[in-house]
């Protein structure tokens, strides 16, 4: 069995990634991960944070993320860390795994892991290619 746990294209049996920076709705025929991607961190609004919290608690959402830290794109790293910590807290309180994007920030991700000491799994999303 092959399971796609992270896709941006809805497909049967896949877990679809949703970023609540943009207004979206959850279609009940899919499972989801929901998170504020670091590339969009400079566009985060209070409404996007509220959507994140609401969506994260939905039973169709089975993972938190893609979230994380990116030294090359997005808002200042301090703000990204604030958002990342919020995602970690959601992951732990809702008992859902965390999907992480990390670019040139692995020491910060490791420090966050030590600081939070999470019980839920952390999944590093890796992508190489064009």
Please report, for each region that a protein language model flagged, where it lies by residue.
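Mid-domain alpha/beta scaffold segments of enzyme catalytic cores
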Residues: 1-130
